[in-house]
Amino acid sequence: MEEDMYVDIFLDPYTFQDDFPPATSQLFSPGAPLDVHPLNPSNPETVFHSHLGAVKKAPSDFSSVDLSFLPDELTQENKDRTVTGNKVTNEESFRTQDWQSQLQLPDEQGSGLNLNSNSSPDTQSCLCSHDADSNQLSSETPNSNALPVVLISSMTPMNPVTECSGIVPQLQNVVSTANLACKLDLRKIALNAKNTEYNPKRFAAVIMRIREPRTTALIFSSGKVVCTGAKSEDESRLAARKYARVVQKLGFPVRFFNFKIQNMVASCDVKFPIRLEILALTHRQFSSYEPELFPGLIYKMVKPQVVLLIFASGKVVLTGAKERSEIYEAFENMYPILESFKKV
């Protein structure tokens, strides 16, 4: 009895109605601790019912409900609101479909942003609301200076171009190598041959020059010779043989082996200025443009493997080719690209 009085005095029965489970809960099972005492169900004020219990079913008969406050027919104002809401909904759905079609790339299905069924509803709702706001702002304040969105393809043409540009790159330098097939005394060559330089602390080769053809050779002690400065393949071969004959006259058993063209450099002018910034942005996979370090754009073509130095004035330098045909092919492939980025 003391416990019942304690509950009646200090506890509010309405609080228990929301916070405590009913007396039939597992807390009052025989397995509960001994210091927990069940409430007396005989007292109506101490019988609790939990709001977590069975949910009452809503009545299906609405005949007793007062619906007199609802109008029988729509007024003219309500009709106008309904028509306006339908128009706004149709406009938003049309803008959303138009926005989805613009984001979907025509050539690459599945790439880019699109509102597909796999995206979450939250993402779709955010994107749709953002699109509606942006379309509303753009319709209110149109921008006449906005540039059209153009699909940019960063692919170098691999197929030969049928139309000829009419520009032929001119060879400026041909680098070749040869093997004299014997060991050489570089000090002896430097002391007895004309037009030579030799500083072993600076460079471990003899630098020799001849006037015809006007070239320079690097002669190493292993017998390797590098000839540079020739304007054609034939001039490079002739110059390499002349260097071998000079060394042979100094008493070395020289033989001329393994002549090979290692690099060819050519240049030309397309006669129009080029927008290097946009070209570098479009063909970023193949080009490198750092105007603070070098004023030209470095374009590395895949096929043929030729490096082009493109300047804003329209001058083009081609290097890295080992045959003359590679230079012509690389320039003919590059010329249509340069025309598309001509400054107007």
Swiss-Prot record:
Regions annotated as coiled coil: none
GO terms assigned for molecular function: DNA binding; RNA polymerase II general transcription initiation factor activity
The name this protein goes by in its record: TATA box-binding protein-like 2
Locations listed in the record: Cytoplasm; Nucleus
GO biological process terms held by the UniProt record: DNA-templated transcription initiation
Biased composition (Polar residues): 134-143
Function: Transcription factor required in complex with TAF3 for the differentiation of myoblasts into myocytes. The complex replaces TFIID at specific promoters at an early stage in the differentiation process.
Homology family: Belongs to the TBP family.
PANTHER family the UniProt entry points to: TATA-BOX BINDING PROTEIN
Protein's UniProt keywords contain Nucleus: yes
Record region (Disordered): 78-143
Gene Ontology terms: cellular component: cytoplasm; female germ cell nucleus; nucleus
Assembly and oligomerization: Interacts with TAF3.
Annotated keywords: Cytoplasm, Developmental protein, DNA-binding, Nucleus, Transcription, Transcription regulation
Organism: Rattus norvegicus
